């Protein structure tokens, strides 16, 4: 799809808030409070099933959809979950472009900034939206497939913002009831995702009518996700758009899906966000209206614990934009005994268009589809950064946003354009770039933050575009992006960057494979022969099994070799086993290294996981030695063996490069003739 073999550079934009850190927007209010509910549902909810949490609200000032700060008035979520400390103050989305619909002005921008122009509800028909004040519209939905039986105590602690020890059974039941209400009211007819567990389309995402809450085979949300949140908003409230960005409506509907996995791999530190921008037009829009030079901005105001010592950066290979701590430790995290983390955003997917060419393919609605092509091969097309308290302050209107979207300074505003580089590199010989701070803070090479501007409060902006949206005989057009919000914690500020990049690689790999991670090769079918002080293992007798293993090819992984182990007991794991032999393909692959996080130190390490010698493939072995006890085999003694197959992925950017089959333990007792 993109970036394991494609160079992608990201850049951060860090805004200088005119409102300052003590702005009332940073104060938690009843307007944002999670407990504010309607007869139909709640107006704010939280994604909180893994190691990172995030609030979503449809009540913001003066419009609707937003990510309000609710944790200690400073963060919109926590990392690690339950710590009481977070990384993001606020995040949002902006859309801008040149609109040709018969109205004016041509340049318009709408979205969710510190103030939002998006109000609750979908657009029913061109120019007509749902009533934003209707309790059935002014709400968010949250579901999890296991809500009936799950232990919701930790979930309730996050939702009701109280210590785990103070959560009551009434809290858990109230939350369980809300899950049930959202399940029954799941707005599939508005575009919320759902799936079936049976039939030819089992576990494929569906968007649109057909969901039946009473059908046990129908499940709301993203397949496989532990939790899914959904909301919808639009920009048709002309009073709000003019007030916030000086821009009249465009006729955009924004559908937000957030989901997370509670798992024992790096996905446990990630929240996924799918944003669908549907151009439906205003009431006066022409049937052939279009928007050219469309850009989508995913921006964030990270407060990485203490906001005053943050820096921004990006990885030009991974396409990862992030914020990290300037100092080895962070005051807020140090106060709870934790090292300074890092947080990043990654566009996993940019908008695509229909070409009809069967050689083209793109992910649309979490499904690879032929005949579609991404507008931009690299989904992040601009990445610049701003710092609070510097000469570059927040954009205040559509022309300033449009300059940011194209990699320029917000002022002088469009149609004037000053490249972002000129304000920071101070080198007229440097070719203007849309990608800033793409150096490496760990090795201190390249352009890194903190040299021109001291550490402080940072705002980051990720941009994808340009692309086009158009009405066809009045029919809507859709752009879809998917973003990963990633939290990572190493042993200090710099090792957290390394862990963050590892998690990002894992996220992209999982997404490109639609979260169906490759299974290991099949386990060899082994026959054993118990002889006089000898054991013979033969895994070549079943040719069908051999063919299935040695022709294995899954998601870039190909067969590489066999391992033979002796285990101390029938219940021992491979980590306790003695590797007796490896028979591998004769090629350039010998030692295979994988990245792993040391559970004791949090450091990201490269460790050997498979060790071959180009011995060539064999399908049998004769054993005369007890490798566990380091002595000859003894008749009458039972020994335990396993033969596994392993595969290798040659892609250096794959999150893991070796897969080994599940060991099948064989008990063998040598006997006298």
Regions found by a protein language model. Name each.
Residues 1-5:
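Positively charged n-region of N-terminal signal peptides that target proteins for export
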Residues 19-673:
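Extracellular/surface-associated beta-sandwich interaction domains
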């Amino acid at each position: 799809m993109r970036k394991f073999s494609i160079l992608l550079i990201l850049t951060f934009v860090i805004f200088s808030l005119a409102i300052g850190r003590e702005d009332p927007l940073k104060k938690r209010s009843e307007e944002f409070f999670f407990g504010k509910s309607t007869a139909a549902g709640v107006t704010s909810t939280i994604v909180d099933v893994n190691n990172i949490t995030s609030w979503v609200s449809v009540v913001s000032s003066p419009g609707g959809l937003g990510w309000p700060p609710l944790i200690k008035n400073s963060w919109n979520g926590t990392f690690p979950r339950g710590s009481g400390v977070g990384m993001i103050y606020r995040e949002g989305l902006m859309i801008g472009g040149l609109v040709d619909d018969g109205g004016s002005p041509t340049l318009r921008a709408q979205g969710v900034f510190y103030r939002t122009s998006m109000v609750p509800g979908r657009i029913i028909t061109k120019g007509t939206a749902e009533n934003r004040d209707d309790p059935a519209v002014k709400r968010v939905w949250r579901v999890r497939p296991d809500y009936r039986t799950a232990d919701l105590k930790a979930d309730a602690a996050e939702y009701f913002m109280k210590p785990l020890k103070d959560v009551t059974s009434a809290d858990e039941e109230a939350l369980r009831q809300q899950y049930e209400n959202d399940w029954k009211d799941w707005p599939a007819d508005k575009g919320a995702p759902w799936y079936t567990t049976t039939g030819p389309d089992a576990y494929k995402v569906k968007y649109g009518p057909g969901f039946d809450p009473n059908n046990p085979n129908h499940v709301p949300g993203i397949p496989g996700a532990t939790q899914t949140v959904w909301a919808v908003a639009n920009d048709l409230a002309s009073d709000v758009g003019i007030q916030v960005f000086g821009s009249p409506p465009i006729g955009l509907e924004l559908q937000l899906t957030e989901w997370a996995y509670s798992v024992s791999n790096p996905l446990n530190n990630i929240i996924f966000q799918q944003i669908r921008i549907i151009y439906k037009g205003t009431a006066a829009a022409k049937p052939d209206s279009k928007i050219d030079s469309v850009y989508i901005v995913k921006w964030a105001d990270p407060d990485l614990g203490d906001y005053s010592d943050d820096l921004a950066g990006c990885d030009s290979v991974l396409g990862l934009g992030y914020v990290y701590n300037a100092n080895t430790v962070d005051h807020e995290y140090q106060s709870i005994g934790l090292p300074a983390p890092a947080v990043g955003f990654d566009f996993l997917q940019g908008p695509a268009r229909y070409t009809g060419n069967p050689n083209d393919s793109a992910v649309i609605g979490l499904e690879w589809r032929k005949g579609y092509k991404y507008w931009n091969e690299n989904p992040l097309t601009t990445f610049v950064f701003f710092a609070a308290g510097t000469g570059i302050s927040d954009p205040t209107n559509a022309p300033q946003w449009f300059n940011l979207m194209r990699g320029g300074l917000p002022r002088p505003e469009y149609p004037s354009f000053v490249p972002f580089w000129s304000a920071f590199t101070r080198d007229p010989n440097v070719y203007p770039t849309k990608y800033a701070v793409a150096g490496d803070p760990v090795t201190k090479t390249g352009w890194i933050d903190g040299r021109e501007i001291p550490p402080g409060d940072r705002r980051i902006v990720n941009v994808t575009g340009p692309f086009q949206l158009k009405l066809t005989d009045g029919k809507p057009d859709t752009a879809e992006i998917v973003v990963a919000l990633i939290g990572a914690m190493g042993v200090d500020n710099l090792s957290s960057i390394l862990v963050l990049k590892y998690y990002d690689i894992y996220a992209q790999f999982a997404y490109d494979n639609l979260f169906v991670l490759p299974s290991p090769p099949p386990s060899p079918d082994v026959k054993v022969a118990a002889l006089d002080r000898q054991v013979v293992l033969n895994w070549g007798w079943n040719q069908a099994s051999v063919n299935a293993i040695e022709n294995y090819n899954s998601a870039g992984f190909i067969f590489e070799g066999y391992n033979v182990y002796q285990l101390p007991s029938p219940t021992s794991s491979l980590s306790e086993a003695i590797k007796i032999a490896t028979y591998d393909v004769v090629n350039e692959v010998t030692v295979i290294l994988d990245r792993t996080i040391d559970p004791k130190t949090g450091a990201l390490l490269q460790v050997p996981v498979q060790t071959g010698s180009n011995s060539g493939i064999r399908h049998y072995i004769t054993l005369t030695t007890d490798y566990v006890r380091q002595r000859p085999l003894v008749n009458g003694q039972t020994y335990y063996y396993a033969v596994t197959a392993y595969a290798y992925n040659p892609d250096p950017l794959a999150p893991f490069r070796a897969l080994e089959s599940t060991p099948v333990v064989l008990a063998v007792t040598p006997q006298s003739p």
